[in-house]
From Swiss-Prot:
Name the record gives this protein: Conotoxin Rg11a
Physiological role: Neurotoxin. Elicits hypersensibility when injected intracranially in mice. May act via potassium channel currents.
UniProt remark on domains: The cysteine framework is XI (C-C-CC-CC-C-C).
Main location: secreted
Disulfide cross-links: 1-15, 8-22, 14-30, 21-36
Location of the protein in the cell: Secreted
């Protein structure tokens, strides 16, 4: 799994239970859910 702030994907999950994989137009990173705002989307 990926640490906070590291790149992630729909397959590669985030280690931190409070983090989500946030897909920005150019990349996806592990951040807190509140930090992931449009136009970014949360990868489930």
């Amino acid at each position: 799994c990926q640490a906070y702030g590291e790149s992630c994907s729909a397959v590669v999950r985030c280690c931190d239970p409070n983090a989500v994989c946030c897909q920005y137009p150019e990349d996806a990173v592990c951040v807190t859910r509140g930090y992931c705002r449009p136009p970014a989307t949360v990868l489930t």
